[in-house]
Amino acid sequence: MFTVGLTGGIGSGKSAVSACLAARGALLIDADQVARDVVAPGTPGLAAVLAEFGTELANADGGLDREALGRIVFADPAARGRLEAIVHPLIREETARRMGEVSPSGIAVHDIPLLVEVHAEGTYDVVLVVEAPRELRLHRLEGRGLPRDQALARMANQATDSQRRAAADIVVDNGGSLDDLDARIEEVWQDLLARRDAKATAKATAKAETVASGTDTAASGTDTAAPAG
């Protein structure tokens, strides 16, 4: 399996890039979706969160009132730590399970917004960073109903463009049209296929050399063995 860590600042257009890659055959694992799934109604994760923070955080349909929980944990680092202690192991386990569904020759794309912030660069074969001009990102976020001041605050709490570039193997400029993006992702996809094949070849070569080395060692031991007297 070949793994790609996909990241970028809020409003950069990671979802559009993910869709383009998925259309070409990548298996997409969305970190935000996994985080929601592990505390879905009826899950052990939701039960653990409600036991820790109170059953009043359950909404009318039995799900988690994420806004109410957010108000608690964002104002209290200790509470945030308790929440992370519950959900992070579940997220890692579920992510690993989904990764395990990828075929040995497949390409898995893990969309993880805070990849650089949690220093996960070394976890993937390739880190792909999506960029877009700041004002365009703000325009996109305002179009989603996020006020400009809140959008700026969220940007300020994320890694900088230069920090993300430093971690990147591939950078995608998503400041143009969807057609521009699709053309760029086709280039990226061919690059990923080539990197995947190179990894597979290197692995096969290393395995063959290990087998050959073991055979040579065994033969050498046989040649130098003292004859029975």
From Swiss-Prot:
Highest taxon above the source species: Bacteria
Subcellular location per the Swiss-Prot or TrEMBL entry: Cytoplasm
Disulfide bonds: none
Binding residues annotated for ATP, in chain numbering: 11-16
Alphabetized CDD domains for the sequence: DPCK (cd02022)
InterPro entries: Depp_CoAkinase, P-loop_NTPase
SUPFAM superfamilies: P-loop containing nucleoside triphosphate hydrolases
Entry's Gene Ontology molecular function annotations: ATP binding; dephospho-CoA kinase activity
GO biological process: coenzyme A biosynthetic process
UniProt KW keywords: ATP-binding, Coenzyme A biosynthesis, Cytoplasm, Kinase, Nucleotide-binding, Transferase
Pfam families per the UniProt record, alphabetical: CoaE
Pathway assignment: Cofactor biosynthesis; coenzyme A biosynthesis; CoA from (R)-pantothenate: step 5/5
EC number: 2.7.1.24
One Gene Ontology cellular component: cytoplasm
Catalytic activity as recorded in UniProt: 3'-dephospho-CoA + ATP = ADP + CoA + H(+)
Region annotated Disordered, chain positions: 203-229
Domain DPCK: from-to ranges: 3-203
Protein family membership: Belongs to the CoaE family.
Alphabetical list of PANTHER family matching this protein: BIFUNCTIONAL COENZYME A SYNTHASE-RELATED (PTHR10695:SF46), DEPHOSPHO-COA KINASE-RELATED (PTHR10695)
Record function comment: Catalyzes the phosphorylation of the 3'-hydroxyl group of dephosphocoenzyme A to form coenzyme A.
HAMAP family in the cross-refs: Dephospho_CoA_kinase
Name by which UniProt lists this protein: Dephospho-CoA kinase
Organism: Frankia casuarinae (strain DSM 45818 / CECT 9043 / HFP020203 / CcI3)
